[in-house]
From Swiss-Prot:
Species for this entry: Saccharomyces cerevisiae (strain ATCC 204508 / S288c) (Baker's yeast)
Note from the entry: Present with 382 molecules/cell in log phase SD medium.
Protein name stated in the entry: Peroxisomal membrane protein PEX27
Record GO biological process: peroxisome fission; peroxisome organization; regulation of peroxisome size
Entry function: Required for regulation of peroxisome size and number. Also promotes peroxisome division and biogenesis.
Main location: membrane
Keyword list, A-Z: Membrane, Peroxisome, Peroxisome biogenesis
Subunit structure: Homooligomer. Interacts with PEX25 and PEX34.
Keyword field contains Membrane: yes
One GO CC annotation: peroxisome
Keyword DNA-binding: no
Topology class, membrane: Peripheral membrane protein
Length: 376
């Protein structure tokens, strides 16, 4: 029996196939792992792009906390400083205005009370106010005798003080009359040589003569009061009383005439005021059309204020004259002994003093306004 020879070439292809299969499996595994890695990377990239889209859709908010707080604090500090500075500025302006008003009123009060007329008016108001109080005390059931006697003594002293303040007006009026007479005589020699003595009566002011006689009677009453207070009683006491009653009657009559003449003067002031108001209205409408009237009517600066103050002064002067006429009628008729007449006299006299004080205050305003405009 013959044995077959061993074929060695058969086993070699089987080994190569196995090696190829193993390498193919390894390649497939590597490819699968690589492909799976690529999928995971692509998913992560897709998710990242989606998140970017979502973020892009959201509104962009820029926040800078430190800078915003700093600017807000700066704004708050700036507004606080501005408000405090405005308040302090307003306070300083208000204090300056208050000081100006105080100084202005103080100057006006000095102008009123430093004059003899202002002191006389204030003493008049005080005298008749105390007189009214003494009359009201008489109606009380419980009478204060000591207080009433002291009150009457104060009233007498105030009346005497008023006579002291008016003392010397007769000499001033007499000097004015003599000066006026000399001026008229010189005018007659220069321009009116052919005129008669009636020239003096036409151009002489009747008010000055009446005022001079009134001041003369006023000073005679003062001398009589001083004599009765400090002098000794003599045998001619009855004759002096008769003479002084006559002087007092003439004193009241002359005061009534002066008030009537003052009404005439007040009417002339009203006419002049109306002219000035018309002139001012024309001047405000057409200033170029009144150049020919500037020499005839001269108004000071700050015309509206001055005209208003002048109007108030003329009105107060008119009220004062009316009250003086009413109070003096009670003196002329001699009815001050009655209670009602005396009460009316005291009330009217207080009203007259108040109106005269207001007139002096307005006059002080006019002078201060004129000084201010002249300074400007």
């Amino acid at each position: 029996m013959t044995s077959d020879p061993v074929n060695t070439n058969i086993s070699s292809p089987t080994l190569t196939d196995r090696n190829a299969d193993e390498s193919w499996e390894l390649l497939k595994r590597e490819f699968n792992t690589l492909f799976s890695n690529l999928k995971t990377d692509s998913k992560e990239e897709g998710n990242f792009t989606d998140n970017k889209g979502v973020i892009a859709k959201k509104p962009i908010v820029l926040q800078d906390n430190d800078d915003s707080d700093f600017t807000q604090n700066q704004g708050k500090v700036a507004t606080a400083t501005s408000t405090t500075s405005d308040r302090s500025f307003k306070r300083t302006l208000g204090s300056i205005e208050m000081k100006k008003r105080y100084v202005k009123k103080n100057c006006q009060a000095k102008f009123v009370f430093n004059t003899l007329e202002g002191k006389e008016v204030c003493s008049k108001i005080l005298q008749h106010t105390l007189g009214l109080l003494s009359l009201l005390l008489l109606t009380r059931k419980i009478r204060l005798l000591n207080f009433s006697s002291k009150l009457r003594l104060v009233i007498q002293q105030l009346s005497l003080f008023r006579y002291y303040l008016r003392f010397g007006n007769f000499a001033i009026n007499l000097y004015k009359i003599i000066k006026r007479f000399r001026w008229l005589r010189e005018m007659k020699k220069l321009h009116y040589k052919d005129q008669s003595i009636l020239f003096y009566f036409k151009n002489f002011r009747f008010f000055d003569i009446i005022e001079a006689f009134y001041n003369l009677t006023d000073e005679l009453i003062l001398f009589h009061k001083l004599q009765s207070m400090f002098g000794k009683k003599n045998t001619s006491h009855a004759n002096t009383n008769r003479l002084m009653t006559f002087v007092k009657e003439q004193h009241y009559i002359l005061w009534e005439v002066l008030n009537i003449l003052a009404i005439n003067k007040n009417i002339e002031q009203w006419r002049q005021l109306i002219r000035d108001e018309i002139y001012l209205s024309i001047y405000n409408t057409s200033g170029n059309a009144i150049k020919e009237y500037e020499l005839k009517y001269k108004l000071p600066t700050n015309d509206k204020v001055n005209l208003e103050l002048r109007k108030n002064n003329i009105t107060l002067d008119f009220y004062k004259i009316i009250l003086n006429l009413l109070s003096n009628l009670i003196n002329i008729k001699g009815k001050r002994d009655k209670y009602n007449s005396e009460l009316a006299y005291e009330i009217i006299s207080v009203g007259s003093g108040v109106t005269e004080l207001l007139k002096l205050w307005n006059r002080a305003k006019v002078t201060s306004a004129n000084e201010h405009t002249s300074a400007v």
